[in-house]
């Protein structure tokens, strides 16, 4: 089994942090700043006032506080809403679903090879005949085995890349979801105080909702590709 050195692990951690966490937050925070700026101008219609507001928004203390809060909320949203309530609610996570009897991603022979290898390594004790989504012990066995598989496949560069891609899509969804909530709140406020400018946010919301659907699909595909690569690398090592 190939092992990553401490230095390699640290390098990968920095790359993942930058690509899967920082970049999505920077993109969606920039969008939220634009959304707030449009709202300020719609309310006050004063470009000088808008410039003063923007100067406050880009101050270091505000950015630090906003980034911390925005990041925490977005990550929670991406985990609780995107993973648990949308893309993997009915189908389970790809790494689990792929080994179920009714899933056709892998052939029966390939599934048996994976299970047999897990048995040989002492990570599996259940009968393969109970490979279905209604069998909780089987699902738990897959989840436990996945931890072992992740450990022995950690060295693979392509697997790491796909993990970064999935993390990027997942966190981008979380940040954009928060932006969409901000847009909804602003539209309601403008609707109460203006007869015209709230309509701007209808178009913004349409674009955001379409983007959310596309990103959710992208995250789902990245998750499936990651799971396929995970088991392929496991069989090869």
Question: Model-predicted segments: where are they?
Answer:
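Alpha-helical oligomerization segments
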Residues: 191-237
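N-terminal first transmembrane alpha-helix
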Residues: 1-109, 200-203, 219
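Polar/charged alpha-helical tracts
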Residues: 6-14, 116, 140-143, 192, ...
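Hydrophobic transmembrane helix bundles of membrane-integrated enzymes that assemble
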Residues: 33-40, 183-191, 205-209
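Membrane-proximal, non-transmembrane alpha-helical segments
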Residues: 126-196
